[in-house]
Amino acid sequence: MSVLFLLLAITRTASVKAAEGDQAADFLPLCEAWQATKALANAAYKLPPFPPDLTDILNFNITVAPEEWKAIFTDGGSDNTWERFAEGHKNTLNGGNWKTRWEHIKQARQDTKEASSPWNALNSKLINTATVNTTRAYIASIADEAFDLYQGTQTPLQTPKALEAASLAEAAKAILCSDPLKPTADGQACTDITATPSKAATCPTGRSSKGGAPIGLDTVCLCSTNKPSMHSRRRKAAAVMTDGQLKDGILKKLLAACPKKPTLNEPAAAARHAVTVLATRLAQKVARAEEGQIILGTRAETDCASSGSACVEYTNFFKDGDGLAAVPWVKKLLAAADFYDTIEKRKESDKNAATAIAALKSALIREFRRPGQEQTLATTGTKSSSPQSTQQKASEAEANCNDKAKETECNSPCKWDKEEKDEKKRCKLSEEGKQAEKENQEGKDGKANTTGSSNSFVIKTSPLLLAVLLL
């Protein structure tokens, strides 16, 4: 805010009488915009790599999975694809889709199938084999949640249309430079004015054409004039023209007179600050410009391209009602600032996802160390009973059958045994019922979770049945 008041004070003094350094306040916002653009050009975004913590989670998950499930992924060859598997198991998959996970599960199986593998050498001792059956579903739910977090980081960022470039680095080149100033290879500068061309042939003239294409050319045209009173002592010799000819290498010399650092360190904020100060300067100039011209600087002759003027004209952008945001370099600079903010937010989101995946791995390892049947679900913080053993479930089913005292009540999966001496046990669980109960329980143990998510590690049928179908 103090900078803004200072610039306003400079403006009011200049409006009374042109003096040495009159254009300094008009020059500074261009300096700020130049420096902010260079800082924005350095910002880039890459999709994060596959997290090592997620690799460990998937490896733990496949290690505790039923053997029938492991068999699906044991073949690490290129022919073992999701598409091939899905085509052969349309009915048993029941809408499940592992396409994004398939290759990662295959890799997890390759990492763990040999007992002497490097991963097993480091991690197998963490697995509590005594509680595998009770932890299996919980570990799989962690794998699901962790993989979903990773998938959320894999959507490419789309550059905004207003940027008119594929990256901030490419956008910066257009913001800083245009003919006759070409961007350098690194995008951090422009080639300079050479061979002293005329200002009238190089700078935009009058209302028939517009300034504002790049910052570099606006800077050259603003500061190139034949009147020494328009410049500070530091730039007087460098910028003062003779015979209306621009000075050789003038852009580099002008930029050397800019402050070494922008007012604000954060690039997007610095860019918006530069545009705000520029808008303030233009607003102060309207009252003293003829016929409502919108100019940056001071017009001394017919237009800003004349040798006696030190200005850049933006009238046409305001005449059409679009205002400062329609000036090409301003429009692109603001779009670049917005995209920079998007990149920073995405980086923070990716960092949070990595932290959450690491926390899930820690929860997984704690679960291996915790005895007992009761599991705590990481996603909700609520408790649910872990899958009971096959033997327990079979015993419960047998007891349910035994409760049937009459043959007419003893229906499938129970079977009436009239030869049984114990009258209380004549209705008993059939062999088919016992097998169904076993397969049902093994299916629960082999699932990643019990939600039925279509893109999870769940095959919506018994892994044992799937293994049979693969044969």
UniProtKB/Swiss-Prot annotation:
- The residues forming the signal peptide are 1-18
Question: Which region ranges are annotated with the description Disordered?
Answer: 373-457
Where in or outside the cell is it found?
Cell membrane
| Glycosylation site residues | N61, N133, N449
How is this protein positioned relative to the membrane? Answer: Lipid-anchor; GPI-anchor
Coarsely, its chief localization is membrane
Lipidation feature positions (GPI-anchor amidated serine): S454
Q: Does the keyword Membrane apply?
A: yes
Organism's domain of life? Eukaryota
Biased composition regions of type Low complexity, renumbered to the chain: 379-392
Keywords tagged on the record = Cell membrane, Disulfide bond, Glycoprotein, GPI-anchor, Lipoprotein, Membrane, Signal, Trypanosomiasis
Q: Which InterPro entries match?
A: Trypano_VSG_B_N_dom, VSG_C_dom_sf
Q: Which residues form the propeptide?
A: 455-471
GO cellular component terms, alphabetically, are: plasma membrane; side of membrane
Keyword Zinc-finger assigned to the entry: answer is: no
Q: Tell me which Gene3D superfamilies the record gives.
A: Variant surface glycoprotein MITAT 1.2, VSG 221, C-terminal domain
UniProt lists compositionally biased (Polar residues) regions at: 448-457
What this protein is reported to do is described as: VSG forms a coat on the surface of the parasite. The trypanosome evades the immune response of the host by expressing a series of antigenically distinct VSGs from an estimated 1000 VSG genes.
Q: What is this protein called?
A: Variant surface glycoprotein WRATAT A
Q: Which organism is it from?
A: Trypanosoma brucei rhodesiense
